[in-house]
Structure formats: C-alpha cells, structure tokens
C-alpha cells in the first residue's frame, strides 16, 4: 500500500503533466512547494556514513607485558631443609634433636667408637671425617673431603681412641700430676727430718757456760796455752834490722 506522501507525489506529477504548470503554481503555491520539498527529500540521494569506533591506542597496549621478576623466598627455606635432612656418614639424629657421631674401628673387629654429640649434622659429619681419616688414611670415605686437616697430634692411634672419652674438667689435674706431687711432698718431708737430726741443739748462754773460757788456771778452755820460753820449739826470734 502506498503511503500518503507517495500518493501526493503521484497526484502532483499527474497534475503537472495534465494541467497547466503556471496555473497550478499561482492557484496553490503552498501546496506546490510542500509537495516539491517532499519529493526532493524522498528521491534525493542519501549518504550513508559508516562510523566505526576508533581504537584507543594507548602506551599500555603497545608495550609487551613485563615478566614477573619477584623472587620467591621459599628457595632459601628449601635449601635449609635439604641440608638438615641430608644424611651424613657416621651421624645419627637423636630424638631430642642432637646429632651423635660414631665410627667403627677395623682394628677392633668393627666395634663402635663414640665420637661425641653435636648441635648440627655438619659438625658431627666433620668429626667422623677426622676419625675416619686417622683410622683408614686416604682410603676413607669422607663427608667433607676438602675440610679434613691432619696434624701430627691427631695422627697417632691414641688420639683416635681418646676421641670417645669425655673431656676432663679444666679444674681437676690428671692422676699422674697428683702422683708426682705426692712424691715431691714425701721427699721434702724426708729431707727436713734428716736436717733436723744433723743439727746440734743450741745451748743457751749462761754465766756457767762462760767459765770454761775464762778459767785459765784450770787448763780447760781456749786460753790454756803453756808459757813460751827460748828453749821451746814454738819460740821463734824475729830479727829486726
């Protein structure tokens, strides 16, 4: 069905073709202009504009996303746990958290020698390495081959056996020193007794003790000397020139 505007346009064309154009324009000017305007508006070319949204070109879209460079802290905790859980040769962990070091002596049918208790497994492993190197030399399998230090004092077998013994207190002297001190004290007591026996008792000075020195006539004392005479052999004449 034709719309009202189309019907008016057809009517206008038929009147324009069949009737006089001038008379129509003069008789109905408003109708003519309205119909003409409607006709041009309907039949005129239409411009269609495609409005596409412009992409927002921002700096964030041009740059690639940066990688996440955050270092996780769990790596350090894992390494510490691995060191604690690592099993060292000759080391056993106690239920209360300490680490005990032991070694088997091949010279005594494989009997165990207790090397001590340590706070960490690394210290216990190093104690085992020193004892193993002393017993087996270069053939020993060690936990830390580069950390072993051999000295002249620890190379002897007595040092290895002494590792299992507990350290003596610094305040208590050894038994040998005690025995030496006892001997010295006995010798000093013997020498003091002999000196006391050899020393004569000292007589106190009294008037009676001086009578021997001054009693010349009795012939007892230091002044009991016979008188000198020219005929006596002790007499000598000194000639003075």
From Swiss-Prot:
Gene3D superfamilies linked to this entry: AP2/ERF domain
Subcellular location: Nucleus
SUPFAM superfamilies: DNA-binding domain
GO biological process: one example: ethylene-activated signaling pathway
Keyword Acetylation: no
Regions of compositional bias (Basic and acidic residues) in chain numbering: 78-87, 170-184
Annotated PROSITE patterns: AP2_ERF
Function: Probably acts as a transcriptional activator. Binds to the GCC-box pathogenesis-related promoter element. May be involved in the regulation of gene expression by stress factors and by components of stress signal transduction pathways.
Composition bias type Acidic residues, residue spans: 185-199
DNA-binding region: 87-145
Segments for region (Disordered): 37-87, 162-203
InterPro entries recorded: AP2/ERF_dom, AP2/ERF_dom_sf, DNA-bd_dom_sf, ERF_plant
Keywords associated with the record: Activator, DNA-binding, Ethylene signaling pathway, Nucleus, Transcription, Transcription regulation
One Gene Ontology MF term: transcription cis-regulatory region binding
Family of this protein: Belongs to the AP2/ERF transcription factor family. ERF subfamily.
Keyword Transcription: yes
Stretches with biased composition (Polar residues): 44-61
Protein's recorded name: Ethylene-responsive transcription factor ERF104
Source organism per UniProt: Arabidopsis thaliana (Mouse-ear cress)
CDD domains: AP2
GO cellular component labels: nucleus
């Amino acid at each position: 069905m034709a719309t009202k505007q189309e019907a008016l346009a057809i009517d206008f064309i038929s009147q324009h073709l069949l009737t006089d154009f001038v008379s129509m324009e003069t008789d109905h000017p408003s109708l003519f202009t309205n119909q003409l305007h409607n006709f041009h508006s309907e039949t005129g070319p239409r411009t269609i504009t495609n409005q596409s949204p412009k992409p927002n070109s921002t700096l964030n879209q041009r740059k690639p996303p940066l990688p996440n460079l955050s270092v996780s802290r769990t790596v350090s905790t894992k390494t510490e746990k691995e060191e604690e859980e690592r099993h060292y040769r000759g080391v056993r962990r106690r239920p209360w958290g300490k680490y005990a070091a032991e070694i088997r002596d091949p010279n005594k049918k494989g009997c165990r020698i207790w090397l001590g208790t340590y706070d960490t497994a690394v210290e216990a492993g190093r104690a085992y390495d020193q004892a193993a190197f002393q017993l087996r030399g270069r053939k020993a399998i060690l936990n830390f081959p580069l950390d072993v230090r051999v000295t002249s004092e620890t190379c002897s077998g007595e040092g290895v056996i002494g590792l299992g013994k507990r350290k003596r207190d610094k305040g208590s002297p050894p038994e040998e020193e005690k025995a030496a001190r006892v001997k010295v004290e006995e010798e000093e007591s013997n020498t003091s007794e002999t000196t006391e026996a050899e020393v004569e008792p000292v007589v106190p000075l009294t008037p009676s003790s001086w009578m021997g020195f001054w009693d010349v006539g009795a012939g007892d004392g230091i002044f009991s000397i016979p008188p000198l005479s020219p005929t006596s052999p002790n007499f000598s004449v000194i000639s003075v020139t």
